[in-house]
Regions:
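Conserved cytochrome P450 K-helix/beta-meander segment immediately N-terminal to the heme-binding cysteine loop
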Residues: 39-67
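Active-site-adjacent bridging/hinge elements
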Residues: 66-75
Length: 136
């Protein structure tokens, strides 16, 4: 739940590009085949219409009890035929690494930390991420 919520708020990519393979009607919009479409992952993952009024807040319980959302609402590793082939390995490795680190260390956010996510090619902390680390 914690990793899923982290990936929702801070996806590894800001957007994915896709080429429309056939003419599509999306609501009142006609999208011809060959059109390049950018799917803004970070904006969809922060959409209050999908995630609720607290969409900007870290809430791992969004994913509790196997709760899921519409396929197009959560896609930190992309979507469709070009989805990241390493997503399952990444999640397993992240869970193992996080468990090993949390068994040995405690973390606190530094008083000097300023939360300011910045969109470049990826989502990055504008002023760094000052963390106080203490061995357990």
């Amino acid at each position: 739940m914690v990793l899923k919520e982290t990936l929702r708020l801070y996806p590894p990519a800001l957007f994915v590009n896709r080429t429309v393979t056939r003419d599509v009607k999306l609501g009142k919009l006609d999208i011809p085949a060959g059109t390049q479409v950018n799917l803004p992952i970070v904006h969809i993952h922060h959409d209050v219409d999908i995630w609720g009024a607290n969409a900007e807040e870290f809430d791992p319980l969004r994913f509790a009890d196997g709760k899921s959302y519409h396929l197009g609402a959560y896609f930190p590793f992309g979507i469709g035929p070009a989805i990241c082939v390493g997503q399952n390995l990444t999640m397993v490795e992240a869970k193992l690494a996080l468990a090993m680190v949390l068994q040995r260390f405690a973390f606190d956010v530094s008083p000097s930390y300023v939360h300011a996510p910045m969109m470049v090619m990826t989502l990055q902390p504008q002023y760094g991420a000052q963390v106080l680390v203490r061995k357990i």
